Amino acid sequence: MEQNLHQTQTVTVIALIIFALIMIAIGIFSARKTKTMDGFLLGGRKIGAWVSAFAYGTSYFSAVIFVGYAGQHGWNIGLGSIWIGIGNAIFGCLLAWMLLAKRTRTMTHTLKSKTMPEFFEGRFNSTKMKVFAAIIIFVFLVPYSSAVYKGLGSMFTTIFPTVSVNTWMLVIAVLTAIYLVLGGYVATAYTDFVQGIIMIVGVFAMVVAIVKNPNVGGFSHFFSNLASVADNGDKITGAQLTSWYGGANWKFLCVNILLTSFGTWGLPQMVSKYYAVKDIKSIHKATVISTVFALIIGAGAYFVGSLSRLVLNNQLPEGGVDAVIPNTLLTALGDPNIVTTIILAVILILLLSASMSTLSSIVLSSASAI
């Protein structure tokens, strides 16, 4: 057991080092494009469709969706929780880009605004609005960042039980700071693009690993196996877990979709992506790309969470719902071999990518606000 854990840790560390070197290299490469304040904060407003779309999508989804939301709602609601991911794609991405992107880009160009506080100052001709917006952004994005750190720490401490969560937080913070300081928004956007690709690969790896688990039974039997889950004392049965509209939780499901979809419309780290798009044509492309990206990540994460009861034999792990996804993955992958270890390393990099992309956007938005 100890040898298997050592093998997993070794492969994971190698993957982390490679990932860190790529992120730093992007930061160094981007440094030459950040000679002005406009270049540092917005990449000179010349960011293309694919990079803008991935930057938006990766900022939308952090490790919180995988470790927190997908684990909690997948465990309690079942397959109906997938609608949260679908709703995020439709309302949080497609509708947001259709209604906000072009208007926001046009107004910020006209007002020459580089940040949300500057936009409020120019739009309403009020310095007080700028100060108020800056305070709100700086104060309330701090606890948001802590939630991202917590989500990532839960997964890494499962693989490295002797390393404290604080140590992982420090590593993430330092690595994010390096490429952010070096390359500003350009570095953030291009690392987001790379991290987005990693997230897509990681989600597919998660889905395959979970579905292949004997308790799940593959794509042909997962539904019938989930329907046979009995009440373990929490009053949740297979009928609830296989309801495509959330069963008794349909009201909660609707509210959650609205909160997690429309709540992002005003987040500065999301809105700033519209500022930097190079032209209207790129906005049209980015609208489609970001929607597809969100659909893959959101639906994939909640699908994995909805099958967690099968993998874990309907027993909530120690640590509660935050431990559902980490334990589901470790159980589904089984005894470590080189293949499963590499898959686990990819998934860990997925979570790291999801967190760092969100954190870099939050930090840049908070710093630029003041």
Where in this protein do the model-derived segments appear?
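Membrane-interfacial loop-to-helix junctions in multi-pass transporters
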Residues: 10, 47-49, 124-131, 160-170, ...
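Helix-loop-helix module between adjacent transmembrane segments
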Residues: 84-180, 255-263, 351-361
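Membrane-interface helix-loop-helix modules in multi-pass membrane proteins
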Residues: 42-112, 251-263, 270-272, 276-316, ...
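Membrane-interface "cap" regions at the ends of multi-pass membrane proteins
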Residues: 2-68, 180-183, 196
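Small-residue-rich segments of transmembrane alpha-helices in multi-pass membrane proteins
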Residues: 49-56, 121-126, 195-209, 292-294
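Hydrophobic alpha-helical segments and their helix-loop junctions in multi-pass secondary transporters
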Residues: 26-33, 101, 141, 145-149, ...
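Membrane-water interface regions at transmembrane-helix termini and the short interhelical loops
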Residues: 2-4, 75-77, 100-103, 154-159, ...
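Interfacial loop-to-helix junctions that mark the boundaries of transmembrane helices
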Residues: 3-15, 76-88, 156-167, 239-258
